[in-house]
Structure formats: structure tokens, C-alpha cells
Amino acid sequence: MLEKANVRLNDTAIQVSEWFRKKGFRTCILKGQGNALMYPNPYSRTPGDIDIWVEGGDKRVISFVRSISPHEKACYHHIEFPSYKGMEVEVHYRPSFLLCFWHNRKLQKYYERVKEEQFSHQVMLGEQGEIAIPTVEFNLIFQLTHIFSHLMNEGIGLRQLVDYYFVICDFYKVYQNSSNPSVSLSKGSSTFSPSPSSSGSGDVTAPSRCSEPLRSKDGGPSKVSPNCAGWDRRDAIGDMTSATATALSSFAANSSAAIDRVQKELKELGLWKFAGAIMYIMQEVFGMPASRLIVHPNEKYGKFVLNEVLEAGNFGRHDARNRFGRSQLGHNLQRVYRDIRLVRYFPAEALCEPLFRTWHFFWRLKYKK
């Protein structure tokens, strides 16, 4: 069932991307099926809807979508889209946002600065076709803002944390493979996409694959050799000690430079402490080695965020602390109550949340059909 759902969603993501391309829009699939490629078995991830970033800005994209379906609702970062073959689609003109106006301004400038690379980063989605997905550096920042948004609004889901674990793993795989494209340094360094027929067996290590078969054409091989084991070629080509040492040195230098860039952006965006909280969870819950953490773990903040995950769940659906009911008024009161709880840890976002919500009300009136 899970396998079939992923195959179906893959097809839909490819078709929706191609449909927008024919209409003159470049696109990039956010999260979702792009994240599935990072899993040991891409068909094992529980699929959701399709989040597609469409180039063009809010006015142009909203106008285009409403020329097809006039009554679709728009919010600051996306507009609803008619379901495509039964699949829910959200069309983004902004990948994500932050509630603090100052930090959000910087985030939107960052997205504008790096968008060209995202729209041109093509990968194979299994054997079904090509889509554009974000680069690994972009994902480290974008998906952290997405998780933060869930924390500030209603609640973080476990799948978002699992996704981020594999985002970090994918980051190091990409830089490891780019440092030594001819030799993959560890058995776990190869991301592959098994055929749907093989994924149901549970054996996700059986297929023979070379390193990084799913990377973009520009960033590495997109096809695999059926005769390549992909992780242990020492017997075939002799002693690789010197080459391995050189590759490790190059990998460390490249990944360190990339981490420095990511850390700089996280500080600029006011996400440093939240990143530390997520790294604490990655280490304590998911067992990620300290050498793979992108910032130093923050135990105090990590325990707080982990408690929020366990108490609330995705969108706060399981939060027993919701004492105001499910009405619109109750929802707004619950948001204020949540802001009070969060202000001690994330004051800029929590204090700006009521202001942003008020501003967003008028923004939606402006774009209301």
C-alpha cells in the first residue's frame, strides 16, 4: 500500500511539474518526494501532498492559478490548487516564512538569491522521470524553517524530524561523493532508488548501485552500472589508502565550508538556538554522531522542543493542553496561549506572531477573490 502510494505520488509530482513547465513556469518540488529520495528505501516514506515551488512571485502565480480555478484560497506563502488525480497540491510562491518581520525579510532575500540553483537542480525520481528538488544546503535551511514554523504555529510532527535526519545524512553523502566521485567511502554512503517491486521485500541493501545514482546531471551520475557494488572496490583496484586519505581531506574541507555557510545563514535568520535544539534531538533520539551535527546541540532548548513534539504532534492534533476548543475564536486564543509558552525560548517569533497574524489578515483580504 505504501509502495503504491509513493509510485502514484511520484507520477503526479512529475506530471504537475511538467504541466507548469508547459505553461511557462519553472518549478521545484519541496519536501515530499524529494525527501523520499534520501531514505534508504524511497518507497518507505509515508507520503503526503505535493508542495511545488513555482517561479514568478505571488501576484503572477495567484493570478495564474485563479485563471484556472477562480475560488482558490491564498495565504502568504502558497495558494491551494485543484487536486490533481486525487492528490492534494499546494502551489508555493515562497518556500516558507518566519513570523519575525526582520528575519523573514532576510529569509525571502536568501530564497531570491539561491532560487536559480533550486529550479535547475534536476534529479531522476526513481525510474519514472525527472523533477527539480532543492540542493542539500538549501534543504538544511529551508526544512529547518519549516519545522520552526510548525513549532510556532501548532505543532511538529515526527515525520518532519525523520525527514530532517535524512536531510543531514544526504548533505554529507553529497559532499563525500563530490570529494571522490569514483570511490564511495562507506557502505551507507550510497542513496539509491530500488524498483517498486523490490521495495516490498524489506531488503533495501540488496541492489547493486554506484554512489549517488539520484543526483542531478550536473552534480554527479544519474544512472548506475549494474556491475558496480558502489561501496567496496578495494579488491578490484588495489590499495586505496592514499586516495582515500585525499578524498577524506577534500570531503572535510568541502563539507566544512558548506557548514560554515549554513551556520552563517542560521545566525542571520535567528534560528541558531532552534537549530541547536533540533541537533540535540538528532543526537539523543535518532543517534546521529556528533561529527554530523550542523551546529552544537543545545540541551535546554532541545528538551523543550522535544516535549512540544511529544505533547502536541503534527499541527497540535494531539495536544491535551488545547483548552479553548476548535472554533475560530478558540483557535486564536490557543495561538496566544502558545505564544506565551514559547516567548521564553523564542522571543522574537513569539512576540511577532500576533502582529504577523494581524498583518496576514489584511494581506489575505488584499488577495481575496
Predicted segments with their positions:
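Intrinsic disorder/low-complexity segments
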Residues: M124, K173-S256
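Conserved NTP-donor binding/palm subdomain of two-metal-ion nucleotidyltransferases/polymerases, i.e.
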Residues: M1-G48, W53-Q176, A253-K369
